């Protein structure tokens, strides 16, 4: 039986230091073999499997929240592009969406994605394109009001060209930011993944117009060889 997700020791340390070497099977590309070997030896992958999370990305949002404390009991959270669901699992626990901590306020977690997902206890999941014309209005209806947190771990499909992928994810992040402007409560928080590459300036400028503070963070759970980082914008101003 999988353990309940927890916030302790998010570093991935404490796992047995056993390295797995994968042989290249006939018909399998060398790059696929390397990816599989990295997955099998990744301490965060091992922790996610043992603690019941749907992916190692859960530890990224755990580490970001440990620092910025935006997933508080009672918060209403929207997770854009939420598949496979690791971020939703973390949010459910931290905002007390199941009401397990009776002395704390009970929050809610709403996840949207283009693909259908397996249910997550404590989260409400919808198959929705957040860039559709009426998506923001629909989300507010489902929430019964505005959100305290909008978060996104989305990434566009990889093209294999670093700069193209960078531009695509910046465009996706900007779309998520405009969505957040429409659904966030005053003082709310926006969290999103970006890839470093030189085109972040306009995104930073946009966010600084609407948030009191904007930080760029590479949490420990992000792989060191990745250009991935996260923007955490706090103190949303409903009026620019």
Curated annotation (Swiss-Prot):
Its EC number is 2.1.1.166. It is found in: Cytoplasm. S-adenosyl-L-methionine binds at residues 85, 87, 113, 129, 153. Residues 1-13 have a biased composition (Polar residues). Residues 1-20 are annotated as: Disordered. Keywords: Cytoplasm, Methyltransferase, rRNA processing, S-adenosyl-L-methionine, Transferase. PANTHER family: RIBOSOMAL RNA METHYLTRANSFERASE, RRNA METHYLTRANSFERASE 2, MITOCHONDRIAL. This is Ribosomal RNA large subunit methyltransferase E. The lineage of its organism: Bacteria, Pseudomonadati, Pseudomonadota, Alphaproteobacteria, Rhodobacterales.
